[in-house]
């Protein structure tokens, strides 16, 4: 039988993933693990670098985004051992001791890297930093972070009226603020809180809805004085902080697990166990949405590991039903909307996703791209200003589609291709390595 999954190099240094599902159906069965959580990996490297003493990190994601974070902090004097998923050691240099780098800091494709660093670097007194990224990152909005940091006294300059990278940051003494954020964004919140660590006094961020709380959990573990007001949906940090290195254990990334949750739900005769997945309640919106769609998903072996909830996720083939989602659920599954759209294409009825306009300023315009590329495969899908409308039941057909160098688009289209008739070619599929370097080998493991 021909190999069902082939990653082909192209003349322009990109890669095309060719998927030809087996002619006889083969369910997804067995046990797998997904890479370490990207959000936690970033934060462990950053806090380890600015703490005193040593931080050890087990299960670090070796994707391109955390590698960018590690490279930036090495350039500013932090000692970070050779990166591997077993154990990484970070020798911190202290909150106010980051060195002025000799060259431009490159965040690559990582919005988390550049936005969180902005808050931290803004308070590094009398030092200058220039931060850039790849073409995609240079097109993404930075004003949402620059504006509150400027209220704290930060001096940050960028392209297009201080809204785009590259960014020039002149470190200064900052003042604490109370900031009411117009959007629920863990990146905005975390950047302000990192800046607040360097201030004298209390810095508070109020959000319209709860965003992921990995920063808050890790701040506390490293010794920061932090309080949460759940009624107001606010977080307050007191500075200046004294952070101490800690052991960090990174669970599997639920955003990566989401691809296999949907795959096993839509591929007949599947029974898959995804082990060691982080199930932080600020991240489990995808589980709630899929369970609302009547996906057969259960949590097994639930436990707490290094302050984060962890479980094994079992998923079986399911008869999915359409749903309507929006509101406070969206920040808890914002990264999973592309793969949720794939699930909706195989559900009975019309699924409507609202309040997800943030997707238009991710690595790609994920609303437009999913409507376009999933539509090429025959899905009945249309854009809404703030989301998508998908009517399930249309038979998908293999097609040539484009990831637009967006890792979550590439992997979502690959899962859709598992149940499409004929061959699908996904252009610029190398983007998957941003968050899931072993995505294609895992495909091969399950169906190859």
Swiss-Prot record:
InterPro entries reported in the protein's UniProt record: Enolpyruvate_Tfrase_dom, Enolpyruvate_Tfrase_sf, EPSP_synthase, EPSP_synthase_CS, RNA3'P_cycl/enolpyr_Trfase_a/b
Pathways per UniProt: Metabolic intermediate biosynthesis; chorismate biosynthesis; chorismate from D-erythrose 4-phosphate and phosphoenolpyruvate: step 6/7
Residues engaged in binding 3-phosphoshikimate: 38-39, 43, 185, 187, 335, 362
Domain of life of the organism encoding this protein: Bacteria
Entry's localization field: Cytoplasm
Matching Gene3D superfamilies: Enolpyruvate transferase domain
Residues annotated as catalytic: 335 (proton acceptor)
Residues engaged in binding phosphoenolpyruvate: 38, 111, 140, 187, 366, 408
GO molecular function, one term: 3-phosphoshikimate 1-carboxyvinyltransferase activity
EC number of the protein: 2.5.1.19
Keywords: Amino-acid biosynthesis, Aromatic amino acid biosynthesis, Cytoplasm, Transferase
PROSITE patterns cross-referenced by the UniProt entry: EPSP_SYNTHASE_1, EPSP_SYNTHASE_2
Residues in coiled coil: none
GO biological process: amino acid biosynthetic process; aromatic amino acid family biosynthetic process; chorismate biosynthetic process
Coarse class of the protein's main subcellular location: cytoplasm
Pfam family, one: EPSP_synthase
Catalysis: reaction(s): 3-phosphoshikimate + phosphoenolpyruvate = 5-O-(1-carboxyvinyl)-3-phosphoshikimate + phosphate
Top EC category: transferase
GO CC aspect terms: cytoplasm
Family, similarity comment: Belongs to the EPSP synthase family.
Function: Catalyzes the transfer of the enolpyruvyl moiety of phosphoenolpyruvate (PEP) to the 5-hydroxyl of shikimate-3-phosphate (S3P) to produce enolpyruvyl shikimate-3-phosphate and inorganic phosphate.
Name of the featured protein: 3-phosphoshikimate 1-carboxyvinyltransferase
Organism, scientific name: Synechococcus elongatus (strain ATCC 33912 / PCC 7942 / FACHB-805) (Anacystis nidulans R2)
């Amino acid at each position: 039988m021909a190999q069902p999954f082939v990653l082909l190099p192209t003349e322009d240094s990109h890669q095309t993933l060719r998927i030809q599902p087996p002619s006889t159906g083969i369910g997804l069965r067995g046990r797998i693990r997904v890479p370490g959580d990207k959000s936690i990996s970033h934060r462990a490297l950053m806090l380890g670098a600015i703490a005193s003493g040593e931080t050890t990190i087990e299960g670090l994601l070796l994707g391109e985004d955390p590698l960018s974070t590690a490279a930036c902090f090495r350039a500013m004097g932090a000692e970070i051992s050779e990166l591997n998923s077993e154990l990484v050691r970070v020798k911190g240099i202290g909150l106010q001791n980051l060195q002025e780098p000799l060259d431009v800091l490159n965040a690559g494709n990582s919005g988390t890297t550049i936005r969180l660093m902005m808050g931290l670097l803004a308070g590094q007194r009398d030092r200058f930093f220039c931060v850039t990224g790849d073409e995609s990152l240079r097109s993404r909005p930075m004003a949402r972070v620059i504006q509150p940091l400027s209220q704290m006294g930060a001096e940050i300059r960028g392209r297009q009226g201080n809204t785009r990278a590259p960014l020039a940051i002149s470190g200064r003494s900052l003042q604490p603020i109370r900031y009411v954020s117009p959007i629920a964004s863990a990146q905005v919140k975390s950047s302000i809180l990192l800046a607040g660590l360097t201030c004298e006094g209390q810095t508070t961020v109020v959000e319209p809805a709860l965003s992921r709380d990995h920063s808050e959990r890790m701040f506390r573990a490293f010794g920061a004085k932090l309080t949460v007001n759940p009624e107001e949906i606010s977080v307050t940090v007191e500075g200046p902080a004294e952070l101490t290195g800690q052991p960090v254990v990174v669970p599997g990334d639920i955003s990566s697990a989401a691809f296999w949750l949907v795959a096993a739900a839509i591929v007949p005769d599947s029974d898959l166990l995804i082990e060691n997945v982080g199930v932080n309640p600020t991240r489990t919106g995808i589980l709630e949405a899929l369970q609302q769609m009547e996906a057969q998903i259960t949590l097994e072996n639930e436990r707490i590991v290094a302050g984060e909830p962890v479980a094994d996720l079992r998923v079986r083939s399911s008869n999915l039903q359409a749903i309507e989602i929006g509101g406070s659920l969206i920040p808890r599954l914002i990264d999973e909307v592309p793969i949720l759209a794939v699930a909706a294409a195989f559900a009975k009825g019309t699924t409507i996703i609202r309040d997800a306009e943030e997707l238009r300023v991710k690595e790609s315009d994920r609303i437009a791209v999913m409507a376009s590329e999933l539509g090429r495969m025959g899905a009945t899908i249309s854009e809404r200003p703030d989301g998508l409308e998908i009517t399930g039941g249309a038979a998908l057909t293999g097609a040539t589609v484009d990831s637009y160098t967006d890792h979550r688009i590439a992997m979502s289209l690959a899962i859709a291709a598992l149940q499409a008739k004929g061959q699908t070619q996904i252009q610029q599929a190398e983007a998957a390595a941003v968050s899931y370097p072993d995505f294609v080998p895992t495909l091969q493991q399950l169906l190859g």
